[in-house]
Amino acid sequence: MSEKEKKELTQECEELKEKYKELEEYAKRLKAEYENYREEVAREKRELIKNANEYLISKLIPVLDDFERALNQGEKGDAFYEGVKMIYKKLLNVLEKEGLTKIHVGEKFDPFEHEAVERVETEDVEEYTVLEVVESGYKFHGKVLKPAKVKVAVKPRKKEAEKVEEPSDKKE
């Protein structure tokens, strides 16, 4: 083999090595893009399912409220009452497994989780303390779907004696 042929083969070999490196880099980029695409599609799918679940669960909240009203009116120990209670607990359990949580009413009123439906003037407890839950509130994966309707304590208004202002300078 001549010197010229060796140079040509060496040059061709170098070009092929360069081409191989380019193709290898291209393949790595494609693989990374594909992985990112798969992750994005999976995230979008999870988000779509979550939004669909949120929509359905928000439509079921009035049903939960109706169950609670029925249970508050029923007589404990009655077979019908116990059956309704069992169905309510099963429904609530299924919804909780999907991400629904009842808003637990703490001691203080929180305008992001509570809706004040009544203000009760009292000095017995600290101001803005939740006194009673009128209707339960719910969250879905941390997002408030329905605020809890509550009665809130407020300080009594001071009834000031009516002041009769007498004009100091009467013009006649």
UniProtKB/Swiss-Prot annotation:
GO MF entries: adenyl-nucleotide exchange factor activity; protein homodimerization activity; protein-folding chaperone binding; unfolded protein binding
Record localization: Cytoplasm
Keywords from the UniProt entry: Chaperone, Cytoplasm, Stress response
Top-level taxonomic group: Bacteria
Entry-linked InterPro entries: GrpE, GrpE_coiled_coil, GrpE_head
GO cellular-component term (any): cytoplasm
BP term (GO), one: protein folding
Task of the protein: Participates actively in the response to hyperosmotic and heat shock by preventing the aggregation of stress-denatured proteins, in association with DnaK and GrpE. It is the nucleotide exchange factor for DnaK and may function as a thermosensor. Unfolded proteins bind initially to DnaJ; upon interaction with the DnaJ-bound protein, DnaK hydrolyzes its bound ATP, resulting in the formation of a stable complex. GrpE releases ADP from DnaK; ATP binding to DnaK triggers the release of the substrate protein, thus completing the reaction cycle.
HAMAP family named in the record: GrpE
Assembly and oligomerization: Homodimer.
Family of this protein: Belongs to the GrpE family.
Name of the protein in question: Protein GrpE
Species per Swiss-Prot/TrEMBL record: Thermotoga sp. (strain RQ2)
Gene name linked to the record: grpE
